[in-house]
C-alpha cells in the first residue's frame, strides 16, 4: 500500500496520521560511517537513546557491583589479600588500606546512585516508554535528549579517573561532607579525587536537568488525541512527577556543588569554619558552616530517594495489573499518593541530620513529617495488594520481580519507621541498620522493579522475548542471595556494628560478628554471580529469543499497539485513546482486556448501565 493509501486508510478509520508516518524518513545509504553514527551513536530517536542508557547503566552496574564486593571482602576479612584489586593497586602487598577502603565505599555509592539507579529509571525507561505510552512520535526536544545521554560519559570518566590521580579517589562518602571534602589536605582522596568527584556530579546534574525538562514538556504537550491526564498509565505519572522533583531539587545540589568547588579552589569559605584543622591540615579560609552543606545536599538527596523509586513504583503498577488481569485498584488515589510522596519528600530532608547538632525542636518537626510519608506509601502498598487480590495471576518472570518489589519495599519502609524516630536514631545512627534500610529501598526495591521492567518491555525493545525458565532461575537465586546479604545487616545494626570502619574488629565487642559478615559476603558474591545468568539470557534473547508480536502480554497501553520493535515515528497511525489504561476483565466483553485504542464497546456499555 502506498503512503497516500495508508494515510487515507488512517483518516477513514477516524485517526490522525502523524507527520513521520505520513512522510517516512528516507532510508540512508548502507555502509556509511556517518549514517551509522547518526543512527546508533549520536541518535536523536528516543528509543535508541533509551537503549543507550540501558546498556550503559548495565555496564556501570557491573562496575558498582565489583566495588561493592571489594567493600564486602574488607569488612568480612580485613587485612587479607584482596582478589584482583589487591594486585591492580598493590595496596600494602595486596591488602586493602583503610584509606583505600573509604575510597571504595564512596565510589561504590556514587556509581550506583548517580550512574545506575537514576539513569536506568529516568534515562532508559523514561526515554523509551514516555513517547510510546502517550502516543507521541518522539520527545519534545530530541537534541536535548541526545545530550542528556552523552553528558553521562564525562561524569563516568571523571569518577573513573579519580582513582589514578595523586591521593586517589574521593573518600568523603557519597555525601561529600565538609570539612573532610573542603580541605584539600585533609586526607588521601581530598585532593584531585574530590575535585573530579564534584566535576562528575556536575555533569550528572546537567544530564538529569535536560531530561526532566524534556519529560515534563513531552507529557504535557504531546499526548495523543483522547489521552487525558487521568488516562495516563502509572508509569507515565511516576515519570512526570519524578521529572518535577528533579527540576525543583537538582538546582540546589548543583549550586551547593559549585560552592564546595569554590571552597576548594578559589579560597571561599561557604562550608569551612574559621580555624578548622583536619588531620593537622589547617583550612586556608573560614567563616562557613558545614551544617549548611548538609541542608543543601539533603534538600536534593532526599527527593532523590523518590527519584530513584517512584518510576519503579509506576512500572510495577502496570506490570501487576497486566499479569493479575485486573484493573488497578484505586487509580486516582495511586496518582495522588505519588504526588503526596513527592510533595512530602521536600520537607523531610532533616531526618538525615538528627545527629548533626541541629536544633532538637527542628528534629521533632522532621520526625513528624517523615512519619507522615508512611501514609501515601501505605496507600500504594494496599492498592497493589488490592490489585492482585482475586486476580488470575500469571507468574511470569516479570510478575515475580514485581511482587518481590512490593515485599522488599515493605521491609525497607518498616525499617525506615525506626530511623524516623529521633530517640531510636541515636542508637542506630551510622550503623549497618542504616545500610540495610537504604539497600532494601534503593537496591532490593528499585533493582527488582528494574528487572521486572526489563523482562516486561524486552519484547517491545528488541522484538523478541527472554527465556522464561532462565528468567525464573535468575529471580529465585537473586531473591535468596539478596535477602541473605541485606536482611542480615539489620542484625548487625541492631547491635551497633559501625558502617564506615575498615576494621571494626579492632573493638573486641564485635569479634563474634565476623561469621555474619562472612555469610553476607558469600551471599553478595552469589548475587553478583547470578547476574551472569541474566546477562547471558539478555544478550542471547536479543538475537535468538522467540519472536514477539506487537502485544505478547495482552496488555492495554499504547506502546503495545506499535510494532515490536517500533520503527521511526513509533506508530503506523496516530493512535486515538478512548479509555483508561487498566480495563481488564471488563464485564460483557469476550476478551479479558480492552486496549486504550479500542472504541467504546456496546456490550461493556450495556453491562455498565445494567450495573447502575
Regions found by a protein language model. Give the residues of each.
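Membrane-embedded and interfacial regions of multi-pass energy-transducing membrane proteins
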Residues: 2-612
Amino acid at each position: 500500500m502506498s503512503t497516500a493509501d495508508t494515510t487515507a486508510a488512517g483518516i477513514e478509520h477516524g485517526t490522525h496520521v502523524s507527520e513521520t508516518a505520513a512522510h517516512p524518513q528516507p532510508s540512508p545509504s548502507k555502509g556509511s560511517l556517518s549514517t551509522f553514527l547518526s543512527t546508533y551513536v549520536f541518535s536523536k530517536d528516543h528509543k535508541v537513546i533509551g537503549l543507550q542508557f540501558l546498556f550503559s547503566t548495565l555496564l556501570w552496574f557491573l562496575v558498582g557491583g565489583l566495588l561493592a564486593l571489594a567493600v564486602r571482602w574488607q569488612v568480612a576479612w580485613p587485612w587479607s589479600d584482596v582478589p584482583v584489586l589487591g594486585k591492580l593497586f598493590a595496596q600494602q602487598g595486596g591488602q586493602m588500606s583503610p584509606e583505600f577502603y573509604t575510597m571504595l565505599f564512596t565510589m561504590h555509592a556514587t556509581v550506583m546512585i548517580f550512574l545506575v539507579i537514576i539513569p536506568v529509571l529516568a534515562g532508559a525507561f523514561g526515554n523509551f516508554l514516555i513517547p510510546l505510552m502517550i502516543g507521541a512520535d518522539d520527545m519534545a526536544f530530541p537534541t536535548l535528549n541526545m545530550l542528556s545521554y552523552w553528558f553521562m560519559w564525562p561524569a563516568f570518566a571523571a569518577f573513573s579517573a579519580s582513582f589514578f590521580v595523586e591521593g586517589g579517589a574521593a573518600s568523603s562518602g557519597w555525601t561529600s561532607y565538609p570539612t573532610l571534602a573542603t580541605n584539600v589536605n585533609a586526607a588521601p582522596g581530598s585532593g584531585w579525587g574530590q575535585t573530579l568527584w564534584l566535576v562528575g556530579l556536575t555533569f550528572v546534574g546537567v544530564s538529569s536537568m535536560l531530561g526532566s525538562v524534556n519529560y515534563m514538556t513531552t507529557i504535557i504537550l504531546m499526548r495523543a488525541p483522547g489521552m487525558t491526564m487521568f488516562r495516563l498509565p502509572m508509569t507515565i505519572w511516576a515519570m512526570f512527577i519524578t521529572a518535577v522533583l528533579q527540576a525543583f531539587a537538582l538546582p540546589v545540589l548543583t549550586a551547593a556543588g559549585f560552592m564546595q568547588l569554590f571552597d576548594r579552589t578559589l579560597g571561599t569559605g561557604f562550608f569551612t569554619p574559621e580555624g578548622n584543622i583536619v588531620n593537622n591540615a589547617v583550612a586556608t579560609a573560614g567563616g562557613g558552616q558545614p551544617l549548611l552543606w548538609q541542608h543543601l545536599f539533603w534538600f536534593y538527596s532526599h527527593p532523590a530517594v523518590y527519584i530513584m523509586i517512584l518510576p519503579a513504583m509506576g512500572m510495577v503498577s502496570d506490570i501487576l495489573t497486566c499479569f493479575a488481569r485486573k484493573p488497578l485498584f484505586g487509580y486516582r488515589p495511586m496518582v495522588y499518593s505519588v504526588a503526596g510522596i513527592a510533595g512530602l519528600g521536600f520537607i523531610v530532608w532533616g531526618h538525615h541530620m538528627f545527629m548533626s547538632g541541629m536544633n532538637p525542636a527542628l528534629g521533632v518537626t522532621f520526625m513528624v513529617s517523615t512519619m507522615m510519608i508512611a501514609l501515601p506509601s501505605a496507600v500504594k502498598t494496599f492498592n497493589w495488594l488490592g490489585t492482585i487480590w482475586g486476580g488470575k495471576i500469571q507468574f511470569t518472570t516479570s510478575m515475580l520481580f514485581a511482587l518481590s518489589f512490593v515485599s522488599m519495599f515493605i521491609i525497607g519502609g518498616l525499617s525506615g519507621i525506626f530511623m524516623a524516630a529521633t530517640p531510636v536514631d541515636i542508637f542506630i545512627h551510622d550503623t549497618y541498620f542504616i545500610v540495610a534500610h537504604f539497600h532494601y529501598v534503593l537496591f532490593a526495591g528499585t533493582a527488582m522493579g528494574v528487572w521486572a521492567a526489563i523482562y516486561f518491555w524486552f519484547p517491545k525493545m528488541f522484538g523478541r522475548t527472554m527465556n522464561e525458565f532462565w528468567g525464573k532461575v535468575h529471580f529465585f537465586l537473586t531473591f535468596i542471595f539478596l535477602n541473605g546479604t541485606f536482611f542480615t545487616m539489620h542484625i548487625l545494626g541492631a547491635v551497633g556494628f559501625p558502617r564506615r570502619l575498615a576494621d571494626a574488629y579492632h573493638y573486641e565487642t564485635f569479634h563474634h560478628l565476623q561469621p555474619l559478615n562472612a555469610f553476607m559476603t558469600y551471599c553478595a558474591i552469589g548475587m553478583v554471580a547470578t547476574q551472569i545468568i541474566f546477562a547471558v539470557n539478555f544478550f542471547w534473547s536479543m538475537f535468538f529469543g522467540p519472536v514477539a508480536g506487537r502485544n505478547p502480554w495482552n496488555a492495554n497501553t499504547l506502546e503495545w499497539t506499535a510494532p515490536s520493535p517500533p520503527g521511526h515515528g513509533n506508530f503506523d497511525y496516530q493512535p486515538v485513546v478512548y479509555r483508561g489504561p487498566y480495563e481488564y476483565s471488563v464485564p460483557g466483553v469476550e476478551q479479558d482486556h480492552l486496549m486504550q485504542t479500542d472504541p467504546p464497546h456496546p456490550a461493556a456499555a450495556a453491562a455498565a448501565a445494567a450495573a447502575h
